[in-house]
Amino acid sequence: MKDSMRLFTTMARGEDGLYSVEITRGYCDGKCVFCRRCYENRDILKPVNSYEADFYEEHFVNHQARVAGLCAKVAEYIALEQKKATVLIQAALLHDIGKIFIPSAVFMKKGRLTPEEFEVVKCHAVLGAFYLKGRGFPASVTEAVKHHHERYDGAGYPDGLKGDHIPLLARIIAVCDAADAMLVGRHYRAAISRKMVIDELLRNSGSQFDPDVVNVMVEIINEEAVVNV
């Protein structure tokens, strides 16, 4: 699998002073059907002001691209079938697309969310899957998007799926999503060290995350640490 990103994301200012942020990045060489589908859906836009444009670029678009990169490494590590690996990367590139339907004031909030706000944010998984289905994406992609916040112990959302009942691709995205959030940080939480990320993943292995995927991610993080010394 090629380890290159093709940027389909732009921020174009309109006459109304708002920016339209394309929310997808293309991965690999752009020749696969999923990348073409991604490219054809460049009109998935989020109108925002200049400050929000920078925020969405970093915490939404760039995050999805990084998660896709981690998913590609997991797929390679476990020798995932090429077709499934392609689906995994496409789903990862779009896993948070439902957040375009979440009010910016909630999505961008720096403090702790209220219970009501958290319920709103939780809707992004279902909204994203529904939206992608309506735009012609296959069930393999939409199901991974819908279930990437399920927990291995069954305490996640939206359907409370447990263990192997959670689609494998969703289980992989869940770990990669969390790893990136900790390694890079969020707007409301600073990044932490690789050791702390590993400790946190292992602490939640078997409860929040698939233990097998966690073990692979730990190996990847350790290898990255060696490479970047």
For every predicted segment, state its role.
Residues 2-3, 15-16, 22, 31:
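Intrinsically disordered, low-complexity polyampholyte segments enriched for Lys and acidic residues
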Residues 28, 32-38:
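Cysteine-cluster motifs in flexible loop/terminal segments that predominantly coordinate metals
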Residues 40-42:
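Short, charged amphipathic alpha-helical "coupling" segments at sensory-output junctions
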